[in-house]
């Protein structure tokens, strides 16, 4: 009887933990299934997919959020899918990469990424101030556009003592602009004459969030996805030094100090460990394909959650100056990124 009770406790704990998340997870799963079916329908009708399942998941999720009031009970599961499932997917993605790819990045590219982040921060902030935005709001927009979107905004807010309304305004448009960028990105390779590697670099440098990079690069295949992910994660690693610097500048060293695990998220560590495991043959070949499939499924679900988290109507509250500042920042980032590609190509 005691043994039965002992076995029941973990099961009951799992149910208590999963129950609040289940409605939102199921909605994300339904949107993901619709996206996968829509992609297959395109292939059957036209011979190929104009829009991949990753982009479709964002589109369907955004459309659903804009047309229907989602139940409050689903919010926890949607947030879980957008954050935790994404983090797991990114960590697992490391199993599809090896150290040889990382070596190919080279010191010039890594240095270029750091320089672009720094220049983008300075010029984006300057553009925001020229448009009349308050200093802290301009800082949030600069951090969001230059590093990793909403995550950078959320991390920078306590470091600079930002007001909640400034955080909400910057996040509102950054989320929508990120989705727009993902939808337009796949047209750039042909327009700019970029190959898969160059496009991966461009997407990794300009797109806000990791799932959006995956969605933007997927149409060009595995090389673009792998390159874009590596560049994006190197960019994310700049978050720690930037937040530490902002804390000192704004005198928030006590309130805004972040722990190491906040500056270097666990999934980046997991991503690197999976690369190491793959490189040293610690992952059996038979597991590589299932792990890649699981990572892809979780990524689709996280992007469905991303779409379900974007309310286009919130743009009304963001304000015209915020929209212009964020758009100018993104254009500037694109110009700098294209310049880095030309520089690495010449080298």
UniProtKB/Swiss-Prot annotation:
Keyword Transit peptide: no
Main location: membrane
Keywords: Cell membrane, Membrane, Transmembrane, Transmembrane helix
Family stated for the protein in its record: Belongs to the UPF0324 family.
Regions crossing the membrane: 15-37, 50-72, 105-127, 140-162, 172-194, 201-223, 233-250, 263-282, 287-309, 322-344
Topology with respect to the bilayer: Multi-pass membrane protein
Superkingdom of the organism of origin: Bacteria
Annotated compartments: Cell membrane
Native species: Agrobacterium fabrum (strain C58 / ATCC 33970)
Pfam families (alphabetical): Cons_hypoth698
Keyword Ribosomal protein: no
PANTHER family in UniProt: INNER MEMBRANE PROTEIN YEIH-RELATED, UPF0324 INNER MEMBRANE PROTEIN YEIH
GO cellular component, one term: plasma membrane
Protein name: UPF0324 membrane protein Atu0671
């Amino acid at each position: 009887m005691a043994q039965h009770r002992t076995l029941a406790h973990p099961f009951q704990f799992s149910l208590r933990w999963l129950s609040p998340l289940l409605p939102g997870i199921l909605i994300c799963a339904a949107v993901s299934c619709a996206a996968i079916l829509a992609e297959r329908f395109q292939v059957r009708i036209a011979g190929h997919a104009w829009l991949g399942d990753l982009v479709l998941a964002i589109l369907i999720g955004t459309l659903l959020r804009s047309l229907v009031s989602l139940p409050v009970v689903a919010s926890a599961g949607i947030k879980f899918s957008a954050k935790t499932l994404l983090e797991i997917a990114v960590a697992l993605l490391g199993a599809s990469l090896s150290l040889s790819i990382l070596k190919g990045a080279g010191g010039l590219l890594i240095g270029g990424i750091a320089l672009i982040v720094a220049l983008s921060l300075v010029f984006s902030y300057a553009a925001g101030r020229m448009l009349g935005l308050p200093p802290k709001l301009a800082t949030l927009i600069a951090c969001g556009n230059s590093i990793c979107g909403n995550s950078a905004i959320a991390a920078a807010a306590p470091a600079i003592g930002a007001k909640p309304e400034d955080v909400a305004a910057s996040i509102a448009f950054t989320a929508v602009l990120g989705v727009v960028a993902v939808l337009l990105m796949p047209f750039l390779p042909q327009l700019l004459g970029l190959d898969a590697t160059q496009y991966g670099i461009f997407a990794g440098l300009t797109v806000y969030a990791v799932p959006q990079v995956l969605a933007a690069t997927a149409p060009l295949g595995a090389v673009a996805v792998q390159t874009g992910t590596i560049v994006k994660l190197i960019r994310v690693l700049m978050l720690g030094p930037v937040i530490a610097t902002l804390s000192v500048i704004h005198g928030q060293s006590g309130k805004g100090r972040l722990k190491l695990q906040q500056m270097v998220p666990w999934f980046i560590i997991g991503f690197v460990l999976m690369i190491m495991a793959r490189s040293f043959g610690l992952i059996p070949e038979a597991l590589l394909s299932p792990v890649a499939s699981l990572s892809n499924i979780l990524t689709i679900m996280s992007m469905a959650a991303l779409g379900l988290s974007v309310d286009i109507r919130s743009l009304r509250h963001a304000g015209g100056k915020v929209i212009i500042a964020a758009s100018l920042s993104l254009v500037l980032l694109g110009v700098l990124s294209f310049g880095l590609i030309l520089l690495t190509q010449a080298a």
